[in-house]
């Protein structure tokens, strides 16, 4: 895993699968969405195989691994079931995330500092089969430093607090928190990605932070695609972040 010379867009297609699973149909197909996203300029495709299988299914992951032209960023919880599945399919990139059954979406970052031994064992286990691991964490120096200690080459900073901020003061504070996290992560020698809650009206400020390698965005893209089409939604987002990062 190397730092990109330009900002990258990772497209999360989980909510294409959410729409499919709502009726238990074969459509819309998240694999087709992934291929359309690649054609529109996505640099990678992110999928989260949750314990409850509420959206992405194992079959989706297997198909994506075979057909993607870019790369798959496989999000998973730190469980024996998911570690065994990862060992079976050997994705090139894995992001370890926290997961609880009741949450609507991932609500916070992984507590690496509070469970270093467990996370370190998972990172080492995945590294042995050639997987490059990132950790989805809050933009907190304690968590970033712990991520470095457990051997992860990359982190993804949770931007949810920034996305949920209500007042201009709160927005500025949370944006600065992310920027400080990026700077600290880079100083630790980590590759720093970011994502969660980003959309067309708040992404530019994050994309403009120097040193961010990749932004992972999903829900906003799928929502916008209902009105403009998936390729157009991805192309618009890619143009926004590239322009902001210049």
Swiss-Prot record:
Q: Which domain of life is it from?
A: Bacteria
Q: What class of enzyme is it?
A: transferase
Could you say which residues are annotated as the site Transition state stabilizer?
156
| GO molecular function terms listed in the Swiss-Prot or TrEMBL record | pyridoxine 5'-phosphate synthase activity
The compartments listed are: Cytoplasm
Spell out the subunit comment.
Homooctamer; tetramer of dimers.
Q: Which family does it belong to?
A: Belongs to the PNP synthase family.
Q: What is this protein called?
A: Pyridoxine 5'-phosphate synthase
The organism of origin for this protein = Pseudomonas syringae pv. tomato (strain ATCC BAA-871 / DC3000)
Report which gene this protein is encoded by.
Answer: pdxJ
